[in-house]
Amino acid sequence: MRGLSRNSGAAAIFAILLILAVHNWSVAVSSQSTEFAGDFPPFETECRGTIAECSVSAALGDGGDLFYGGGEMGEEFEMDSEINRRILATRRYISYGALRRNTIPCSRRGASYYNCRRGAQANPYSRGCSAITRCRRS
């Protein structure tokens, strides 16, 4: 009875390993196909562009120049400066002066974009002074 239990345990382990090997082999074979079968397109070569460029060029599969050749999906990732300014205008941390074309928001050295006055500090020190923080003493 003891020998039968040992053989059935070994057979069960062998069966599990065989199932895992067949599963891994089937996944490896199916991943080598060039068909799109999942959330992400298969990448056959190394891409040195942005994530959007690599994803779109892999989805096309022809290796064509999508962004400069006038591809359908390339226009989605192109944004002119007006669209960029509108998107940035919705954020709270960029001033309208920073969004104007061909202008410098604040030309004073060390001054904040939000507080562009003479003598205004960009990041005024507001914490207490201690030996650990090594703050300057005035």
Swiss-Prot record:
Record's comment on post-translational modification: Proteolytically cleaved, probably by SBT6.1 (S1P), a subtilisin-like serine protease (subtilase).
Tell me, in one coarse class, where this protein mainly resides.
secreted
Chain's gene name: RALF23
- Homology family: Belongs to the plant rapid alkalinization factor (RALF) family.
Which InterPro entries does UniProt cross-reference here? RALF (IPR008801)
Q: Which Pfam families match?
A: RALF
Q: Which keywords does the record carry?
A: Brassinosteroid signaling pathway, Disulfide bond, Hormone, Secreted, Signal
Q: Which residues form the signal peptide?
A: 1-28
- In UniProt terms, what function does this protein have? Cell signaling peptide that may regulate plant stress, growth, and development. Mediates a rapid alkalinization of extracellular space by mediating a transient increase in the cytoplasmic Ca(2+) concentration leading to a calcium-dependent signaling events through a cell surface receptor and a concomitant activation of some intracellular mitogen-activated protein kinases. Negatively regulates brassinolide (BL)-mediated signaling pathway (e.g. BL-induced hypocotyl elongation and branching limitation).
Q: What is this protein called?
A: Rapid alkalinization factor 23
GO cellular component terms, A-Z: apoplast
> A GO BP term, please?
cell-cell signaling
Q: Which residues form the propeptide?
A: 29-88
- List locations, semicolon-separated: Secreted
- UniProt KW Signal keyword: yes
Disulfide-bonded cysteine pairs: these are: 106-116, 129-135
Q: What induces it?
A: Repressed by brassinolide (BL) treatment.
Q: A Gene Ontology MF term for this entry?
A: hormone activity
**Which residues carry the site feature described as Required for proteolytic cleavage?**
85-86
